[in-house]
Amino acid sequence: MFGKEDRRVEHTRRALHQALIALVREKDYDQIAVREILDRAHVSRSTFYTHFAGKDELLVSGIEGIVMTSGRGHAPTSFSLPILEHHDQHRQTGRMSRQTRIALHGRLRALIARRIREDARRSMVGIGEAPALPPDLLAQFVASTFIVVLDWWLDTRSPLSPVEMDEVFCSLVAHAVHGARTASP
């Protein structure tokens, strides 16, 4: 019974995330009502609130699903390719308003920064010396740079593939971080 229940929970959460994705392509995020998400996902209000406190929590959960499960423990840029691939799938089927993208990418930037900051702090445990770059600064820099690269890619409708954009992003970050570590104060 437990396995069957887990599948139902996963199915419900997936349906809700897909409904939200479809709706953000049709209208501004701020104008989407929970009722619209429920109708699109064929989920009851009580079921929705069993899983999420509101549409913001649903949104953050979807972003975390991509960010937090991608390449943990590797380079601070390991989240990039899965997010670019996700956007590539959706940029072929429709566009969202600039206002919605700003709202969503603000949340994405915050989640990326949190993940990088946590990973950087974990990797420094027991080292004893100050890192070349403060973890908070590195996290904010990498996350903000990613959003700039992502927005440029989407705005220009660049023909570069997700893999190529990942290489561009990683190169920008590596160059900047390496330069910061070798530059004298």
Model-derived regions: residue spans:
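N-terminal intrinsically disordered/low-complexity leader segments
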Residues: 1-10, 124-128, 180-185
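Basic, helix-initiating cap at the start of DNA-binding domains
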Residues: 1-27, 31-32, 36
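Helix-turn-helix
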Residues: 23-57
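Short, basic, alpha-helical segments at the C-terminal edge of helix-turn-helix-like DNA-binding modules
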Residues: 33-34, 62-71
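Hydrophobic alpha-helical connector segments
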Residues: 71-109
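Amphipathic alpha-helical packing segments from all-alpha helical-bundle domains
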Residues: 78-81, 101-128, 133-151, 163, ...
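Secondary-structure edge/capping motif, primarily at the C-terminal ends of alpha-helices
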Residues: 91-98, 123-126, 153-157
